[in-house]
Amino acid sequence: MHFAGKLAKLVNMSILPTLVVATALSLSSPDFSSNGMIPAKFTCEGASTSPAIHIGNLPAQTKSVAIIVHDPDAPMAGGFTHWVAFNIDPAADIPAAFKGGVQAMNGAGKPGYTGPCPPTGVHHYHFMVYALDTRLGLDGKAGKAELEKAMQGHILAQGDLVGLYKKSK
């Protein structure tokens, strides 16, 4: 059976309408390259402000953007979350030292971004950005788990930009 026939069979079996596939956002930063070292000014050895993130392929129907920055290498169960923010107005750029949207609870129990500060060795920091089809009804007391649950079924596209950091001292 050729491709069109197989596709028609899938549609007739009602399988296709249940598939939900988010497209990929293209993420970059003017401050560090993908899998490159994050400059100290964005860490505990500097001002601990968030780096700028450029978002490519943002779907036109995006109503809000969310970001989670997570270090899976942190020496604690589940890693450490450095930033949780959501209800960010959709735009191609999140500027450095960004304070917009709802700045929610990071792994330290504080709102907003806290820079990388690994105890030893090189850690990987995942800057995960989500394009959503809605604004979320959460407040700033939400953390990573609450945001992930609220985003279910609303992700239009997502991307992951990884930066590395190792303390100099």
Predicted segment positions?
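Bacterial N-terminal signal peptides that target proteins for export
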Residues: 2-18
